[in-house]
Regions:
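Cytosolic, long alpha-helical scaffolding segments
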Residues: 1-220
């Protein structure tokens, strides 16, 4: 089971958990909550497998056997695995907050004043979709050693800052229930982090590609 496949699968699972954690705000079903918990466990298991493979490879200098061109790629993949684990962990944290909220509502310890604002929720889903797309592109660029693709990802991240600020202003302008507002801010922050992870992976891909090009010139 190649480490690249493990990382790909981890990313799919973690992003799915993140998406479900946002959907769970409107559909607070036990099944959806459990889906995020299960996904977090699956991502963790794959993460442990990937780390063991990396540790085994670096101890025996088996970078070529793992499909790497230089030993430095061990660190790159370790960072990516950490980022993906953080995505699933943040999704689980959101679900834990929603579970606490729902329990307080069920026990009538808490009364939500208003329904979820559709405009805010729709824009949050849109921002989250952009975050997912950016992260998926960063993983593809890393695997393909795509220098130009990595550059585009960094530019896109900068362009999404305005969209993020607009969403923050929209949330601030609305009279949201404080409990719902806190969870919405958590979800927005999780989406922003995914974009930052994508940017970091793209920057690492750029650095790796430049180093490989320079090395090839030195050899010639």
């Amino acid at each position: 089971f190649p480490i690249e496949n493990a990382v790909r699968r981890m990313a799919v699972i973690a992003l799915s958990a993140n998406r479900d954690s946002i959907l769970a705000l409107k559909n607070r079903s036990k099944e959806l909550f459990q889906s995020v918990i299960n996904a977090h466990h699956d991502a963790n298991r794959l993460g442990l497998y990937a780390v063991r493979q990396l540790k085994f490879g670096i101890e025996r200098n088996l970078f070529r056997e793992l499909g790497f061109r230089t030993p430095k790629e061990f660190l790159l993949y370790r960072i990516v695995v950490n980022n993906i684990e953080s995505i699933s962990k943040n999704a689980l944290n959101t679900i834990n907050n929603l579970t606490t909220l729902q329990k307080q509502i069920d026990e009538q310890l808490l009364f939500i004043k208003d329904a979820i604002d559709e405009e805010v929720y729709t824009q949050l889903l849109t921002f989250n979709s952009h975050a997912h797309q950016l992260f998926e592109e960063s993983i593809k660029a890393m695997f393909k050693r795509d220098y130009f693709g990595a550059e585009k990802i960094i530019t896109k991240r900068e362009n999404f800052i305005q969209l993020e600020n607009e969403l923050i202003r929209l949330m601030t302008s609305k009279k949201l229930d404080p409990n719902i507002a806190a969870i919405l801010r958590l979800m927005l922050d999780n989406s922003r982090r995914i974009m930052e992870y994508a940017k970091n992976i793209a920057e690492l891909t750029l650095n790796r590609t430049v180093e490989e090009i320079c090395t090839s010139f030195e050899i010639k």
